[in-house]
């Protein structure tokens, strides 16, 4: 019997989730975890509404995993330490997560991979070191999947977009059928029996995280997977007018899905598939905006200096 740990990050949903699908398909028992990253939270204002948005999304993930027969372990601290320690404690054979492309996230993931290797090798010297598997999930094409004919990264959007569209096939828009293997989720009873005092299996409050309580009504966006779904369905009714209305705030012409895409409560594959399936200028313009996300992540990967500097400084 093999087991794995899925680390939720900027992918706060239980459907069409690459890492969760691959873990469930490959292992008999799959644990799930979310870490409230203290290295990030400690730098934020105590009234930062992003934390409330994330908290609501985590609550929904926990509820959905419970409905599917699983559970969500909640931790707070530095994931560079928390994830390897949890993997060693659970005795899993692998940790699964979806890839992040920001420089700080790349450094974090490299440290997590090294600490997993070091800790698990020390705790289980007779076994192969645990693996840390990362999957593409928040973009359609990543890193080096769309390049110039010379094999170099694009630096101008329109040629990148044209190459992106040329490469696109239905294969890249296929959803991951997580529920097909949901029986492999490790449930609450398993965790409470094995670790009755050590693991938090409930979502903390904002106050417990050190933040000011926020009335859900004060959040300007509906939250979580259900909120993202609602916004998407509402936007499909306005899609035909997107190209003309998006630049006018009073027209309510945008999708309002930016935060949901940022934290993964919606699936980029689902959105791109819908946009690609529709005709008209509105759908084409929205698809172009979704392609821009891939372009930006590709630029961030190849040119990490853009985090703090101009991409092409004026000479």
Regions found by a protein language model. Give the residues of each.
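Trp/Phe/Arg-rich N-terminal binding region typifying the photolyase-homology
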Residues: 1-172, 176, 282
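Glycine/tryptophan-enriched, flexible segments
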Residues: 152-314
